[in-house]
Structures are given as C-alpha cells and as structure tokens.
C-alpha cells in the first residue's frame, strides 16, 4: 500500500489526545496547549502540564512540518533525499514526576516521507520509549520490559531483542560511561516489509507507552520521601539534561535546523542540580542505582 501521511497524522493527533487524557486522569491537573506555526511550512501542538498532583512537568508535543527541500545537513548523509519535498510528523513526550520513587519516562513515535514527481517516495517510521528510574525496583523494570516485549511479539520474535539493544546503545552517556536509564525500545528507518506493517508497529508502540508506564506511576506515587531522595532525584536529572544537550540526535537536529526551541527543550526537567564529584554512600539506595541501570535482560 502507498504510504498515507494523512492517516498517520490523524493517528498521531488522536494519540496526543489520548495520552494527555490518561496522564490527566492520574494527576488531576490539566494540560495547557500552545499551538504554533512553522514559517517554512507546518506547525504543531505543544501541551504542558505543570506542578500537578503527581507530575512536576509533563510535556506532550505533536509536530507536523513540511517543505519543498530538505536542509543540507540532512541530504549530506542521505543523497537520495536531495530535490524532494518532505513531510515529518511525530508525537514526543517526557514526564518528570514529583516523587523520586516514580521514574521519569520518555516516548516518541514519528513518520517521515520525501517525494518527487516520477519517483517512488522515500519514507520511514521511528520511535520508542525508555524509562529513567532514580530508585530501582525490579518489579517495575520487569513490567516495563514485559509490556515492550509483548507489544513486539506479533511483529516477530526478534523485534523486541533488536530494538531493546538499540535503545540500550542509544541512551548511553559516553562521557559518563553509563546508561541514561533502563531502556525500553528504540527503532528508526523502519520501512519493511510494507507501509501497513510498519504503521501498525508504530501504533503499537505509541499505545503501549501508557500500558508500560502508568501502572508504575500508580504503584509508586504515594511512597513517602524526604529531602535526601529529592536531592538525589535532582542530581540524577542532570544526566537527563547532559544526554539531551550532548548526545540526542533529535534535539541537535531540531536546534540546528531552526526548529521551535520551546518545543524541543520541553523535555528538560524544570529543576535540576549538579554537585562536583558527588559519591553516594556505600550500601545506600542511591549507590545501588549505578548497578541497577546496567544493561541486562529483564524478561
């Protein structure tokens, strides 16, 4: 089947609505919407929930941009895109909870298509979701990865292991020699065997995110915590900022190509701290995190 960008766009708009409704149902606070237009073509809907009952900040962003030609930075690596008009669309979200026992989570699903008359379109899907705990709970990690594995199974037994490894490899801070969190799924350049199959997988990932995340939120959101746990959460959030500004391809591409800065940086935690040469006490729950986030098979 020929790629249907309109069908993908409708799914993404509905996905943004659904995820916002689900997060509001858990939190009680409402999202504030900021609609924007891109000068070169397209626009989006950025939605942010701030200082809610559960979430310190949750951002759920939809964007759909298009243009007559790709930027040179993109065609340098993919010469087949030169001279083509393009459309890029996606939903991207990050949730930063108040409670340090509730992990931060991130998800993204996206579609890209470039066309020119008389030629087959070039298209692909990408996306995934990943979890960044501050305090490790095995049952949470197992639930997260089991949900990821189960949504992948209808698409082949090798899908989950492949995209889990890709996620582990991608969300890695080389300058710290550590993982950002416990991973999940990451895929890109997906265009085989056909559009329908790839679109169905992208939909499964988009819908699977809240199935994976919200039960963990419900389990941890009422746990008591104090200043020590909060300080550790803010310190570990520093790793999130470091990854996004130093290594994340999407953030760098968006900033380098004149994307909407407010929406791109919506993933940033509202409060964060750094501490020179911080070392958690041996045997403490904080010290245990470095071992917990090491790559392993959770299911």
Swiss-Prot record:
Pathway given in the UniProt record: Porphyrin-containing compound metabolism; protoporphyrin-IX biosynthesis; protoporphyrinogen-IX from coproporphyrinogen-III (O2 route): step 1/1
Cofactor(s), by name: Mn(2+)
Record key words, sorted: Cytoplasm, Heme biosynthesis, Manganese, Metal-binding, Oxidoreductase, Porphyrin biosynthesis
SUPFAM superfamilies in the cross-refs: Coproporphyrinogen III oxidase
UniProt-annotated binding residues for Mn(2+): 96, 106, 145, 175
Site feature (Important for dimerization) residues: 175
InterPro entries, per database record: Coprogen_oxidase_aer (IPR001260), Coprogen_oxidase_aer_sf (IPR036406), Coprogen_oxidase_CS (IPR018375)
Domain of life: Bacteria
Name this polypeptide is given: Oxygen-dependent coproporphyrinogen-III oxidase
Residues binding substrate, per UniProt: 92, 108-110, 258-260
Catalysed transformations (reactions): coproporphyrinogen III + O2 + 2 H(+) = protoporphyrinogen IX + 2 CO2 + 2 H2O
Function description: Involved in the heme biosynthesis. Catalyzes the aerobic oxidative decarboxylation of propionate groups of rings A and B of coproporphyrinogen-III to yield the vinyl groups in protoporphyrinogen-IX.
Documented EC number(s): 1.3.3.3
This protein's record includes keyword Zinc-finger: no
Active site: 106 (proton donor)
MF GO annotations: coproporphyrinogen oxidase activity; manganese ion binding; protein homodimerization activity
């Amino acid at each position: 089947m020929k790629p249907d960008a309109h069908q993908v766009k409708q799914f993404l708009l509905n996905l943004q609505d659904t995820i916002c409704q689900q997060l509001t149902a858990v939190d009680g606070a409402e999202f504030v919407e900021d609609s924007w237009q891109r000068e070169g073509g397209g626009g989006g809907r950025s939605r942010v929930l701030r200082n809610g009952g559960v979430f310190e900040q949750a951002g759920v962003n939809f964007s759909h941009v298009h243009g007559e030609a790709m930027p040179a930075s993109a065609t340098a690596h993919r010469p087949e895109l030169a001279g083509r008009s393009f459309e890029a669309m996606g939903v991207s979200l990050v949730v930063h909870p108040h409670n340090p026992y509730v992990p931060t989570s991130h998800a993204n699903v996206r579609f890209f298509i470039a066309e020119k008359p008389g030629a087959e379109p070039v298209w692909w899907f990408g996306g995934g979701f990943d979890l960044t705990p501050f305090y490790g709970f095995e049952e949470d990690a197992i639930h997260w990865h089991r949900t990821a594995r189960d949504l992948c199974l209808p698409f082949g037994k090798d899908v989950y292991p492949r995209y889990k490894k890709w996620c582990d490899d991608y969300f890695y801070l080389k300058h710290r020699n550590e993982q950002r969190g416990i991973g999940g799924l990451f895929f890109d350049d997906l265009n085989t065997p056909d559009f329908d199959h790839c679109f169905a997988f992208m939909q499964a990932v988009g819908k699977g995110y809240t199935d994976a995340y919200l039960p963990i939120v419900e389990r941890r959101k009422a746990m008591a915590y104090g200043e020590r746990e909060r300080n550790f959460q803010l310190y570990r959030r520093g790793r999130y900022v470091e990854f996004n500004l130093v290594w994340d391809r999407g953030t760098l591409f968006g900033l380098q190509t004149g994307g909407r800065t407010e929406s791109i940086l919506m993933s940033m935690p509202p409060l964060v701290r750094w501490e020179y040469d911080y070392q958690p006490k041996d045997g403490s729950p904080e010290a245990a995190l470095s071992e917990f986030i090491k790559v392993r098979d959770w299911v």
